[in-house]
């Protein structure tokens, strides 16, 4: 009886984990498409991305609902509890990233600005952070998690460089707003990393000194 219940819990967790990874991969791909639409002034793609945001984020609600059912029905403990918590937090952060992407797509429609290479680099860094976080979640891989968190420093550096060269916000148009949204996406990936670190090492580390000694080296 208990083995059957345990197998059912494992199956449900595995399925919702797979769905979260697919959702994350789709979000990562949308980061690239959205920033590309902004750089190229591609209004058609930008509109398509905005119009599909709600449908894409339905996945977040399904994942969260399934995790709540798992927590309520199975009352998992230890690693299973941490996994369900990590999956739910990841889905929430991915939803927020997709909302930020819709704002960037809106800027693509409003008008094209001079776009320095920093924006493309920031976009790729966010995608790398998401992909590494998903790999860490899927495989309990601390090295991928370290790489994801370290990339946040690169993201901040790129933002700071851009801010330094665009001090006059009145002349930078939507450029700094796009950069801020990309930096905020990095914040949300760090939120994922926080919970995934808890899954792997059994400690909340992002806002703790352990974070700097374990993940940022």
Swiss-Prot record:
One MF term in the entry's GO annotations: protein homodimerization activity
Keyword Amino-acid biosynthesis assigned: no
Cited Gene3D superfamilies: Phosphate transport system protein phou homolog 2, domain 2
GO terms (BP aspect): intracellular phosphate ion homeostasis; negative regulation of phosphate metabolic process; negative regulation of phosphate transmembrane transport; phosphate ion transport
Localization per record: Cytoplasm
InterPro entries recorded: P_transport_PhoU, PhoU-like_sf, PhoU_dom
UniProt superkingdom: Archaea
Transport in keyword set: yes
Alphabetically ordered keywords of this record: Cytoplasm, Phosphate transport, Transport
Primary location group: cytoplasm
A GO cellular component entry from the record: cytoplasm
Subunit text: Homodimer.
Annotated family: Belongs to the PhoU family.
Function comment: Plays a role in the regulation of phosphate uptake.
Name under which the protein is recorded: Phosphate-specific transport system accessory protein PhoU homolog 2
């Amino acid at each position: 009886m208990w083995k059957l219940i345990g197998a059912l819990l494992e199956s449900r967790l595995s399925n919702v984990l797979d769905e979260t990874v697919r959702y994350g991969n789709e979000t990562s791909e949308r980061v690239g498409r959205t920033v590309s639409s902004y750089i190229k002034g591609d209004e058609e793609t930008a509109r398509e991305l905005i119009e599909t945001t709600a449908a894409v984020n339905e996945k977040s609600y399904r994942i969260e609902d399934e995790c709540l059912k798992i927590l309520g029905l199975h009352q998992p403990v230890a690693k299973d509890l941490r996994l369900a918590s990590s999956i739910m937090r990841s889905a929430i952060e991915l939803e927020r990233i997709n909302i930020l992407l819709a704002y960037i797509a809106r800027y693509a429609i409003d008008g094209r600005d001079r776009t320095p290479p920093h924006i493309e680099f920031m976009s790729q860094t966010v995608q790398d952070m998401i992909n590494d976080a998903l790999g860490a979640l899927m495989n309990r891989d601390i090295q991928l998690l370290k790489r994801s968190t370290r990339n946040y420093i690169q993201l901040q550096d790129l933002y700071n460089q851009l801010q330094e060269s665009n001090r006059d916000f009145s002349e930078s148009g939507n450029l700094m707003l796009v950069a801020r949204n990309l930096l905020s996406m990095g914040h949300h990936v760090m939120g994922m990393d926080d919970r995934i670190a808890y899954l792997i090492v059994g400690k909340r580390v992002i806002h703790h000194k352990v974070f700097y000694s374990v993940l940022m080296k």
